[in-house]
Amino acid sequence: MHDFLIPKDKSKEEKYRNIVSQIDSLVEGESDIISVLSNISAAIHQTFRWLWVGFYIVKGDELILGPFQGPVACFRIKKGEGVCGKTWLHRKTIIVPDVEKFPGHIACSSQSKSEIVLPIFKNKKTYGVLDIDSEELNTFDRIDQQYLEILVGIIERKLIDNS
């Protein structure tokens, strides 16, 4: 077992530095990607207390709900629809300061106010996305993007190692 010990009085960047090293060691040696994604979503959710942290996995022409922490979520998202679908389509991170102002936003939860979605790649193809929602406006910034992309890199290495 592994306990996550992230002091609450640390800055966002210090929390990220801490969680990156802990997640890296947590997933070391685990070959099942669903288990890896499950614990990563739990660790991020536990550390930052955001509304929703989870993964959608590409299956055919849809993103299918994967491991997550938070309220009940949408099961399927089409390519190009909502923030997750647009992240898949454009293959780049999208930060949404106010989801009400994002054209085509899919409201899986009425509590969501801001969002960040990052693509996950396997062999140059989109494997899925990491989706994080907050109950506050303007939650996510470049610091979040920088460190969450490092965490996505850990996932991508696991996908390649376990091919």
Language model features by range: what are they?
Residues 42, 150-153:
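Generic recognition of well-ordered alpha-helical segments
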Residues 114-121:
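A short, aliphatic-rich beta-strand micro-motif
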Residues 51, 58, 62-108:
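Regulatory sensory and allosteric helical modules in signal-transduction proteins
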Residues 1-67, 158-163:
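Intrinsically disordered, low-complexity terminal regulatory regions
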Residues 2-7, 133-151, 158-163:
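Regulatory loop-to-helix N-cap segments in sensory/regulatory domains
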Residues 47, 107-112:
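Short loop/turn motifs at secondary-structure junctions and domain boundaries
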Residues 128-129:
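Short glycine-/small-residue motifs
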